[in-house]
Amino acid sequence: MTDIKNNIAIIRNRIKASCIKAGRQPGEIKLLLATKTISANDILVAFKEGETIIGENKVQELKEKFDALQPVAHQTHFIGHLQTNKIKEVIKYADCIQSVDRLELAEKLQRRLEFEDRTMDIFLQVNTSYEESKFGMLPDHAVKLALQFSKLDRLHIKGLMTIGLFSAEISKVRKCFQLLKRIQTELLDAGIPVTELSMGMSNDLETAIEEGSTMIRVGTAIFGKRPFPDSYYWNETKEPPDLNLGSSPAAQGLG
């Protein structure tokens, strides 16, 4: 069984060491638990350790785990690709959407939120590695799109999100994070308060923190390996097999 408590302690130590190296304070970094395929019971174990921000990639998982997690105050971020036909469900269960990457999606979110008379925190997802396999707006379009999104009063732009290049060459991964930081600076200069940078995962969080990340998204290093490669879960057009993600005993081995 995965030692979630110990793994969280290890991640906190990695954050602390990275902050010391970068001349930053550990309190500047938020830890988001990437909980795709992780059972509600395992998430509750992490909650007991004081980590209460989770990120889900699939709308179905948001719904399946919602009731089981409700007794504990927490934030749920949607970090997967969002199809427009899933907007109604996502805004019902999520507190923030980190994957807003196109004008059509932003405008449809705006209309739905107007209908429900509410607002939603969002991050803009930027494809800083220019990989065709990834979602996210291209860096060249980010500032222009952000300015358009900022006119939609139901959307509160809180930050930027990216997935670093899948590479063992740290210098190439670093360039992705540096690019997102530059885009943030441009947007701040333009008066858009994008204070959060969601970048860095289990394998590259140190580099992300050195380059200014304020939120890292960690799943594997806390909950253990998943039954499918990470690339699978970033494709919202594919539905996963029934992994029974509720609080039943069969689901507990997935973390």
Residue map of PLM features:
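Conserved alpha/beta-domain cores
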Residues: 1-203, 209-211, 225
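Positively charged, low-complexity, intrinsically disordered RNA-binding extensions
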Residues: 204, 219
